[in-house]
């Protein structure tokens, strides 16, 4: 009731919110992608392992899947980069979760390709996540694949479309990563003249 003299409102409530019964209710699972390790993984779960989790969740009647952040956390190229909430980009995904075979195959004479099966078996057998070994190999693999395939993918219509749709963040993200690697830190305050991004 409204007290007209004191111009105040008194609210009486039992403390319970009443919702319509039609609201969605569902059980789910929260999981970091690196925990979805399969025999096809490379020491950690990756993006290609997610469909199997989705199939399992549907089979057991779960309605929701929540992942720990998937964003790039590689700010120092050290073990500190393992923290999922220390993202350096709101858009860039963490290379830790790359599925190397889905990216493309290196030539058979490439040293990384020769090591792949043995390295994969060792990393998958480890009871721990060998973060530095995994991310180091994945960066090296991606870099080698880039130089092997750059003429092909730079002219690929799917790549061109992706770049055009995402260049609003992709160019500045690539510049950030290049400067991070050049200066050895993601702290842009230590980049001297490059501390302020200039789109021009």
Mark where each language-model region is.
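Acidic/aromatic-lined carbohydrate-recognition and catalytic surfaces
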Residues: 14-200
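Short beta-strand elements
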Residues: 2-18
């Amino acid at each position: 009731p409204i007290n007209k003299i004191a111009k105040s409102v008194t609210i009486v409530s039992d403390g319970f919110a009443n919702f319509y019964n039609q609201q969605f209710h569902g059980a789910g699972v929260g999981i970091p992608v690196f925990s979805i390790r399969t025999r096809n993984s490379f020491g950690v779960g990756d993006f290609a392992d997610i469909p199997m989790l989705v199939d399992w969740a549907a089979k057991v009647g779960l309605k929701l899947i929540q992942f720990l952040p998937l964003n790039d956390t590689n700010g120092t190229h050290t073990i500190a980069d393992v923290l999922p909430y220390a993202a350096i980009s709101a858009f860039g995904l963490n290379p830790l979760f790359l599925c190397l075979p889905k990216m493309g195959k290196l030539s058979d004479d490439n040293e990384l390709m020769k090591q792949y099966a043995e390295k994969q078996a060792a990393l998958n057998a480890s009871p721990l996540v060998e973060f530095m070994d995994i991310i180091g190999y994945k960066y090296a693999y991606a870099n080698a694949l880039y130089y092997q395939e750059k003429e092909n993918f730079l002219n690929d219509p799917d790549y061109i479309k992706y770049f055009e749709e995402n260049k609003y963040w992709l160019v500045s993200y690539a510049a950030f990563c290049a400067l991070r690697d050049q200066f050895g830190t993601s702290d842009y305050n230590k980049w001297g003249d490059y501390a302020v991004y200039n789109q021009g």
